[in-house]
Each structure stands twice: as C-alpha cells, then as structure tokens.
Amino acid sequence: MTFYLGTHVLNHLEKTNVPLFISRRVFDKRKSSLDAMGNWALDSGGFTELNMHGKWTLTEQEYIDRVNRINETPGLLWAAQQDWMCEPFVIEKTGLTINEHQKRTVNNLIKLRKLDTEVAIIPVLQGYSLEDYKNCFEMFESNNIDLRSEPLVGLGSVCRRQNTNDIERIVKYFHHKYIKLHGFGVKINGMKRYGEMLESSDSLAWSYDARWTKRHCSKHKENPTTKNCANCLQYALEWREKVANQ
C-alpha cells in the first residue's frame, strides 16, 4: 500500500521525497510552482467546501483550471474529483439526501472528464452505510464508468468515522470486487486491520497529534523553538516512520 503523508504546508514538497497528500485549497493563494522532490496527490478540498458553504463554489471548469495550474509543480500523480461527502453533519449542511450527493458526485466526474487536463482525475465512491456505497457503485456503472478498470478509486466519507468495523466491511466488499481503493484519512487502527486491501491511503493525523499532545520532534525536543510541531516536517516524518513500523 502506498501511504501518502498529509500536509498543509506547501514547502514540504521541496523538502522530502516521501509521497505527500495536499488539499487544493492550500494552493489557492500560491502563484508560482514549486520544485517538488517526490510524488504527491491532490485532495479536492471538498469537505471544507461543503462544510463552509453547503455546496461547491467552484464549477467543474474552474476546478480543472486550478488543477492544471497546480500541475505546473512536478510530481502530481492524481487529483480527486469534486465529490459530495455523506457524513450526517454534511448532509445537514446541504439539506440534500445521500442519494442526491451520490448523483452529484457521479455527474461531476462525467463533466470533469470532458474537460482538458493531463491530470488523472479519480472517481470517489460516496455513501455512509455499505448499502449506500453499493448504490453509488451502481450509479457509476449505469453511467458507463467501470470502477473495476480504474487505476484508483477514492473511498469517501470515512476519515471522520470512528467505527473501524463499518469501514472494514465496506473496504472488504469493494476489495472483493477488485476495485483499487484509496482510503481518505483512514484511521491508523483501520490501516492495521485492512491496509493490505487498500491500494493507497493518506493521513494528516500527525499534525493533530503534535498539536494536542504538545510533543516535539527529535529536532525540537531538547530546545523547543515552537509551541508545538503541528507544522513540522521532522515531526511528520518521525510519525510516519513510527506508523510504518507498527
């Protein structure tokens, strides 16, 4: 499994060659490209969009325009589509149903793939229960999008869920359908249990860990120069190594 280290600090791209996962929103105020050392992937920033606005504020063309500009930084492997998350509090924000979120997710991918870009845009399965995800799979199928033939398919609405058993059942189901899944923000305990069934996953948990525990990396432990290491690449890399060795 490829593990992408989540980060909200753009210059981390120029300081490490480990695979990174970065939100499109972090690039919004950046006007020039970076000299990335390694490969990385782009999150759509959809959770923040829906949480803040109850809808997407970017059209498909605007999103692709931003993805194309971001792609001037080397190493971008893929970008997630503009999906519609299905956690209950997101559904409450939009006032729509899970089924409508799924329809909009499928329609978004269809529109994005008609636009001009060299970046691979990956589809995202959305839902909350296993039956929801099955329904989303069928929606893609009915629109002639065969998820089994896709190089990678995102599994959405899992990163803020604590019930690892539910997510494991969902991952197992689609793994047995030979779908190459990317788990967005999968919990560390989840990766231990079903990581081998994922093609890739990402996590920004190191930053929250540093902020709330107030632990420092080896570089800052003896002589802390910051309140915490929530933005510290050294802390992130040490956390990543610890997780990899568990």
Model-assigned labels for residue ranges:
Residues 1-15, 45, 68, 80, ...:
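Alpha/beta catalytic cores of nucleotide-metabolism and tRNA/nucleoside-modifying enzymes
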Residues 1-108:
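Non-catalytic, usually N-terminal nucleic-acid engagement modules in DNA/RNA processing proteins
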Residues 23, 32-33, 44, 129, ...:
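Generic serine detector
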Residues 68-201:
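Eukaryote-skewed repeat-based solenoidal scaffolds used as protein-protein interaction platforms
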